[in-house]
Amino acid sequence: MADLKPSLTGLTEEEAKEFHGIFVTSTVLYLATAVIVHYLVWTARPWIAPIPKGWVNLEGVQSALSYLV
């Protein structure tokens, strides 16, 4: 006998659980990758100055911008 209450997505219960597992795993991997990459970029060039002269690496950018303005 057919299901009396068909799914809105057309997936069976087993297929929905499999899809959910893959979705959760890929989301966790994406977030972990983003955290690692943000940490690596932060160590290379912090975007918030931790000390008063924390923006010394941007002196070249300031001189380049002076030519544009």
Curated annotation (Swiss-Prot):
A Pfam entry, by short name: LHC
SUPFAM superfamilies: Light-harvesting complex subunits
Family membership: Belongs to the antenna complex beta subunit family.
Gene name per UniProt: pufB
Residue ranges that the UniProt entry lists as topological domain Periplasmic: 45-56
Physiological role: Antenna complexes are light-harvesting systems, which transfer the excitation energy to the reaction centers.
This protein's name: Light-harvesting protein B-1015 beta chain
Transmembrane segments: 22-44
Propeptide: 57-69
Keywords carried by this UniProt record: Antenna complex, Bacteriochlorophyll, Cell inner membrane, Cell membrane, Chlorophyll, Chromophore, Light-harvesting polypeptide, Magnesium, Membrane, Metal-binding, Transmembrane, Transmembrane helix
